[in-house]
Amino acid sequence: MMEGRGALKTVLCFGDSNTFGYDPIGMAAGDRARYPFETRWTGTMQRLLGPGWRVVEEGLSGRTTVHDDPFEPGLCGMGALACALGSAQPLDCVIIMLGTNDMKTCFGLPASDIARGVESLVLAVKRFPWAPGCRRPSIVIVSPPHIGEGIRDVVLSSFDMRSVAVSHEVATAYRVIADEQGCAFLDASEICEPSPVDHIHLSPEGHGALARALADVVVSLAGQ
């Protein structure tokens, strides 16, 4: 029997390496791939929201919105979304923070197409066949942090300066999608910036700032 919608509220965080909690310093040192749960924005948000909430992490490094990576299989967000929704339901809120990996040079996508990928995920959430006792969750679209310009000096990077430019353009396109689809919106680039270590991934301070901002959004939606 499906769990009813009781007092406990559940938030699904669907994203890429910055939801997984990729640790750029630990990776550079070769001793840790992931921040501890209490450092990741998902873990910090769990603490801020308190015992009446359950935060479900669904972050995967390299995940795209709707595209198959030609070099590494299994990274298409659309291909993983239904399983994530089904296993975590009932849900009160779904946070989608994807798009950075769509900016890779192998895709060459403009900001508008990346935003359409996010829109496809939003529509998939809305159309998901929720079990009895579940109603459609609210949706938060998060435009990802900018890619740092230092990426130009990274050897064999999957990103280039065009990727940096697109990372500065997607927030406008994401906001349009959020308005059209009736979703909440947060521009993470206004809150946090990538680590100077690899110019892509968040520092612990960035995770904390993002957690505080998203906790406010989630609580606000719960009160509606």
Task: Label the model's feature ranges.
Residues 2-59, 69-70, 84-88, 94, ...:
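Serine-esterase "nucleophile elbow" of acetyl-processing enzymes
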Residues 18, 25, 62, 101, ...:
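Residue-level marker for beta-strand->alpha-helix junctions and adjacent short loops that shape enzyme
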Residues 56-64, 192-193:
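Short connector loops at secondary-structure junctions
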